[in-house]
């Protein structure tokens, strides 16, 4: 998994998945292009977290300060960010995947989020998302832990809602074909 390559060690994580059944074409591309703009819950949660109103698909995560670190087309896409602020207000400009891996300063926080498609069979599929956070020191970890305590429930709601939207839109598209 790409996420293991870029952030194998971490102190915080969150994992969610959804299962799809049926003979579905183009699942990965539909996952990336899923339109979250019709989800009032996602828009509301993005707004209260101070996130960009323009994040309407997985591919738009770059508008929130993430960079696309890597992709295994048809299987997994990975985004990451580096910051020295536990609330992720000031993301450092990371221009390459290599630079992301090399950053190990004790004043930073590195975060990654992936979206992954696993085909269990031709008619059974799992879409998952995992978020991992690495803190460079005990001091920054304790600051982030306080933030995570309050934000984690909202983060979980966002991820679960995203997966629900992806599943719904993929199944609706399959019915139209």
Where do the protein language model's features map onto the residues?
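Hydrophobic residues positioned within well-ordered beta-strands of beta-sheet architectures
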Residues: 14-16, 111-113, 127
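Hydrophobic pocket/interface hotspot
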Residues: 27-28, 129, 166
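Hydrophobic-ligand binding "helix-grip"
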Residues: 69-123
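Active-site scaffold segments
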Residues: 114-116, 128-131, 147-156
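Short acidic, glycine/tyrosine-flanked loop/strand segments centered on an H-E-D-like triad
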Residues: 123-145
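A conserved amphipathic terminal alpha-helix motif
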Residues: 143-177
């Amino acid at each position: 998994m790409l996420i293991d390559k870029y952030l194998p060690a971490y102190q915080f994580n969150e994992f969610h998945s959804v299962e799809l059944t049926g003979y579905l074409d183009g699942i990965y591309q539909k996952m990336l292009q899923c339109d979250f703009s019709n989800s009032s819950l996602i828009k509301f949660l993005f707004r209260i977290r101070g996130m960009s109103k323009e994040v309407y698909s997985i591919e738009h995560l770059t508008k929130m300060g993430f960079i696309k670190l890597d992709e295994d087309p048809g299987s997994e896409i990975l985004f990451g960010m580096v910051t020295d602020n536990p609330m992720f207000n000031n993301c450092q400009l990371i221009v390459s995947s290599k630079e992301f891996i090399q950053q190990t300063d004790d004043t930073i926080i590195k975060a990654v989020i992936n979206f992954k498609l696993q085909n269990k069979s031709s008619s059974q599929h799992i879409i998952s998302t995992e978020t991992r956070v690495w803190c460079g020191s005990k001091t920054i970890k304790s600051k982030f832990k306080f933030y995570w305590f309050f934000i984690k429930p909202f983060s979980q709601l966002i991820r679960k809602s995203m997966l629900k939207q992806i599943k719904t839109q993929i199944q609706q598209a399959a019915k139209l074909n």
